[in-house]
């Protein structure tokens, strides 16, 4: 019997909606990354993108444990000399709440073209509204 290998053109991708309200950031991100990679499917193949599309709602209401709300710091570099910027978790949630979940999930995906393709299937929104109703997403309880 030959080993099964998924082909990119035969992969069936579903759309799911996930509510992030009250969920712990890291635990949510690991499950999202797992589903973006397709590891929950029997036909998972490491070199083929077999994952599903995920819509995350209420990103502004995601939870963190301990003192991370004030102590966790996000850094980014502007490209200029002395241009390293930092923001706490609280500031990131106030300014761009979607980015917090995106950063957490992106770090858990493979680095390279395949990882970037997987990351493009993640859609994160701060509120409860999204513009993917035409895809008829199913509710996913994580």
Curated annotation (Swiss-Prot):
Q: What is this protein called?
A: Large ribosomal subunit protein uL13
The processes (GO biological process) annotated in the record are: negative regulation of translation; translation
The family assignment reads: Belongs to the universal ribosomal protein uL13 family.
Q: Which GO terms describe its cellular component?
A: cytosolic large ribosomal subunit
User: Tell me, how does this one assemble?
Assistant: Part of the 50S ribosomal subunit.
- Functional summary from the UniProt entry: This protein is one of the early assembly proteins of the 50S ribosomal subunit, although it is not seen to bind rRNA by itself. It is important during the early stages of 50S assembly.
| Organism (species) | Sodalis glossinidius (strain morsitans)
Q: Does the keyword Cytoplasm apply?
A: no
**Taxonomic placement:** Bacteria, Pseudomonadati, Pseudomonadota, Gammaproteobacteria, Enterobacterales
Which keywords are on file for this protein? Ribonucleoprotein, Ribosomal protein
* GO MF terms held by the record: mRNA binding; structural constituent of ribosome
Give the range the annotation lists for the signal sequence. Answer: none
Quote any Pfam family the record assigns: Ribosomal_L13
The disulfide bridges present are none
């Amino acid at each position: 019997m030959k080993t099964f290998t998924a082909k990119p053109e035969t992969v069936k991708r579903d759309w799911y909606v996930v509510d992030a309200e009250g969920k712990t950031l890291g635990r949510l991100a690991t499950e999202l990354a797992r589903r973006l990679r397709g590891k929950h499917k029997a036909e998972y193949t490491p070199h083929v993108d077999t994952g599903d599309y995920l819509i995350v709602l209420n990103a502004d209401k995601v939870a963190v444990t301990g003192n991370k709300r004030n102590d966790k710091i996000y850094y980014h570099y502007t490209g200029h000399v002395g241009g390293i910027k930092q923001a706490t978790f609280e500031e990131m949630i106030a300014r761009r709440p979607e980015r917090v979940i995106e950063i957490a999930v992106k770090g858990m995906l493979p680095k390279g073209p395949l990882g970037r393709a997987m990351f493009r299937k993640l859609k994160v929104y701060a509120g409860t509204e999204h513009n993917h109703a035409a895809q008829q997403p199913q509710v996913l309880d994580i």
